[in-house]
Amino acid sequence: LKFLSLGKWFLVVLCISGMLIQYGCAFKDIDKRLFVSAIGIDPAENVENGYKVTVKVALPFGAIKDSAKPSFAYLSREGHSIGEAIRMLETHIDKVLELGHMKTIIVHEKLLRNDMQTFMDYFIRRGDIQLISYVAGARPSAETILKVEPKTEAPASVALINFFGATANDSPYVVTTFLFQLRRDILADGINPVLPLIETNEKGDELIVNHSVVVDGREDPTVLSTIETKYFNSLLKNSTGLTYLVKKGSLELLLNISQSEMTYQFVPREGSGVPRAIDMHIVMKGIIGESNKDLSIAKLDEYNRLASKEVKQKILHFLIKMQEENLDPFGFGLHFRTTRLYTEDLFTAWQKAYPDIEFKVTVEVKLQGTGTIE
């Protein structure tokens, strides 16, 4: 009994000692942290080959109904690297910058080059930054875009996230690129990453996203127009809600495309594994949403042929333009590399063949109605 009594006392002392050496909390209180909703990267003005980092910080408020609009603070700092600038920003505030909820990274248009991996490396290495964060280009600057607060932006929300998330805006003119996807495509041979380009109006109270940028090693990145961005989305990402304007003589048709699918295969050159052509087949389904003349459902096959011919010309023109500029946003080269037996000169052979490859495009438009009731 005496032994059991000593054992019990030993357990009590051991438990008390363990409680004394425990920390009160492993994390900082929520009121000691500032949550960054977006971050912008611009070329530094006062630091040679440096960067200007701007963070958009969400300010807390009591209740959503007590706030008429979102409340944000903006902090900026220049540094030789992204990490250095962010560390210096922490000396400007009395709290800790929390990056775990950040979903949008905005990069100045002039920084969208192949060497952007040197500063994007910071976001990949930090464990608290989500790899599913959206990455976009900015014009005229990332700081300007971050400070735009649209009138449609609701309290406790960030408009930038709604543009790229599938839960809100689903426009076919908006390209969505994730951080992990950008990193993967930059390091891969045979594909050029494509990022959305965010702009603003003259008043600075609206965000406009209907252009995109093809990332390449050039000093001035290639910007895709609104129409070219739509073609890219419809072919590669099978976006819905597309519209195509078809003209023949005095007849004008506006097609509302609800489904789009592209398949292609390489046509090899005789006696060589290098492709001489790309045989591409595109199927689109939709209805006629608008017309300047009366339409008849009996002529639906005629409208299909007319639409197929017009859409083919538009898409072929876009593909040839990308080829002439030696850009490959669709990743034809990457597909070729990954479906062939590896050799040291495989990608070199593709680079030599790509400028002369012929695009054989077949478009099949299947209109399901004229949008009218007879």
Task: Give the role of each language-model region.
Residues 2-374:
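Membrane-proximal alpha-helical signals and transmembrane carboxylates
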